[in-house]
């Protein structure tokens, strides 16, 4: 564990060290979450897995508002199609449709050429729960297949 911690604290970290430490610290949610975030940052192609693990930890610990905060924080720092899709879903679950629309419109104006923005706009225009769910699933599958540069 000591060598993993040393590797995770290095300037050029080995991302797998952060993942191992997250798994090792699963009994301590805050530490595990910090390592999953570190892993996602340094291995973007695996970020959706990390975010899903973080969501599960937060739900297991009944920290539901923190799930929303996670995705808001990610979107403040930079654009992430997965974070946008999940945050829109969360806002819709809370029936905060205006906030969801404002969020999507903000990214539509920023000219990000990501399919998630347009698909989420389409999702918001639908009243059907099944259609919304299908669009969310489509977004997530497309995002899993993309490679971040």
Show the residue positions of the predicted features.
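Alpha-helical repeat scaffolds
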Residues: 1-7, 30-41, 64-75, 97-110, ...
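Register position in tetratricopeptide repeats
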Residues: 25-27, 60, 93-94, 127-128
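Start-of-helix register in tetratricopeptide repeats
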Residues: 16, 48-49, 82, 116
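Generic L/I/V-rich hydrophobic alpha-helical segments across diverse proteins
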Residues: 35, 83, 90, 104, ...
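Alpha-helical solenoid scaffolds in eukaryotic macromolecular assemblies
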Residues: 9-11, 15, 26-27, 51, ...
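Short coil turns that delineate tetratricopeptide repeat
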Residues: 12, 44-45, 78-79, 112, ...
């Amino acid at each position: 564990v000591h060598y993993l911690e040393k590797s995770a604290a290095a300037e050029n970290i080995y991302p797998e060290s952060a993942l191992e430490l997250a798994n090792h610290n699963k009994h301590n949610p805050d530490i595990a979450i910090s390592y999953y975030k570190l892993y996602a940052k340094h291995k973007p192609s695996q970020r959706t897995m990390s975010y899903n693990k973080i969501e599960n930890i937060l739900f297991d610990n009944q920290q539901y508002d923190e799930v929303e905060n996670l995705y808001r924080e990610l979107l403040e720092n930079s654009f992430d199609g997965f974070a946008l899709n999940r945050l829109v879903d969360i806002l819709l679950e809370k029936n905060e449709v205006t906030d969801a629309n404002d969020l999507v419109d903000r990214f539509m104006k920023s000219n990000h050429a990501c399919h998630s923005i347009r698909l989420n706009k389409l999702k918001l225009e639908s009243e059907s729960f099944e259609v919304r769910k299908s669009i969310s699933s489509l977004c997530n599958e497309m995002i899993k297949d993309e490679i971040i540069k």
